[in-house]
């Protein structure tokens, strides 16, 4: 049977699941925060395309100019997430989703498509080895993070200068996050409790405007962690991962 795909729109957004957290029967704060965030982003050309099934199979991308990441460039798409999880894996859905994004970019006369990668694959980033099969290449770096790009016209985007700073003045734990990922709110609350119980100094910065995201002091997709002023990871972490970071082991 041919797969059916759905693009979220202002009309269907209230009633469609958002893939990442679909097993809960009650309203989930992170999902509803993401839904509200998407309601504004869809007006800017943001795309959330998913399999018409109760599964985690989707791609999410936006015009780079309005993507909430410290990456600069003109006329590009930025991919936030491409995720195929569980039983649907191995059926070619990831390839079809990527191909649909690239087709959209070409149809709109875009200069290309970019996404965040790293020297070592991060758990909370899309599979960069998969992207490279389509011709994505590293065009810029910020520490161990890479800007992967498929250019159609020879132009390339780049990390904002602030993203290469990789330091903040705060001590202890510092986290920046957006509502782009529905897991963020719950993760923040659990980390906040963990730090309070152990008397760990912690600051959590909810990024709520595009201009904030565009000037963040590190590579960023929807989450960033600093410890004692030094950038650690874009992975969403729990208490155990924080303890490793405190022991100077990066995640």
Q: How does the language model describe each region?
A:
Residues 67-79, 89:
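A conserved beta-turn-beta hairpin within the catalytic core of GNAT-like acetyltransferases
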Residues 228-251:
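Non-catalytic, surface beta->alpha helical segment in thiol-disulfide oxidoreductase systems
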Residues 116-117, 132-149, 232:
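Conserved catalytic-core motifs of GNAT/GCN5-like acyltransferases
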Residues 84, 90-105:
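Conserved acetyl-CoA-binding loop-helix of GNAT-fold acetyltransferases
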Residues 54-65, 78, 83:
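Conserved beta-strand in the GNAT
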